[in-house]
Amino acid sequence: MIRRPPRSTPLYSSAASDVYKRQGHGASYYWIGKAPSAQFFTALPFGLNAQEMNAWLHYGGGLELWEEAYDKFNLIPLAGGNTGVQMAGWFNKEINSLEDIKGTRMRIPGLAGKVWTEAGGEAVLMPGSEIFTNLQTGVIDAAEWIGPYNDQTFGLHQAAKYYYYPGWHEPGPTLEVIINKEAFASLPSDLQEIVRTASRAVNQDMLDEYTARNNQALETLVNTHGVILKRLPDDVLKKFKEITSKLLKELIAEDSLSKRIFESQENFKKNVSEYHKISEKAVYEMRELN
């Protein structure tokens, strides 16, 4: 079951497609109730990382599919930020096996929330502003937010002491800029291009900032605040991956656009992963040599 805790408020009270609204900024997976395919444009569990996501959107046909998905809502989507690989979350208990997932109430949205529920936990939906209080008071047992840079600012280390990785649920989460189509069309072509270019610049700048700041924040969390950094067990990650595959098969069987998007993303991931084995991965391994 996925539920809202008491006193929670809707994440969005109105859509940018309202003729009186001009644009918005958020994450597409909050819209999966209206558009199941929206999940693909934030992040998929075990999916593309930030570098791959940007490449797929801008050079692999992803942006065109995103535009198609939002067309019926009278919206133009643009990538407007990426925080890089996220942390798996904050927990008030250790996760040593699948048994520890059972009954654990966790703030985790999107497809990952459904995975968590199928694994025996309970996914809870709430805006970021409510995470600290609900985690501190025991309304929830765990929460994912973003990563060390943001999580430290939110004070989440004061509400739970176990900090888990890897971020299986959001390996490369993209934020979106959504623009009313009529409002965008009213701009001259040069200003339209400025908007697109500015959004793309912000998208990359956010990733640069998080890459620079996350480790500094993590060192403070661990060395100053005594946070206990832990890795999720392999059997837990394997189960999450198995459930993710099952849920995606169900989704693409019900929604033809989701099927096309998924196939595009999977083919792109397969191709770039082959090269990454001898490039990105090889460099990481090389740097570990003594």
Task: Indicate where each model-derived feature is located.
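Single conserved hydrophobic/aromatic residue that forms the stacking wall/gate
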Residues: 1-16, 20
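N-terminal secretory/targeting leader peptides
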Residues: 14-53, 61-63, 68-290
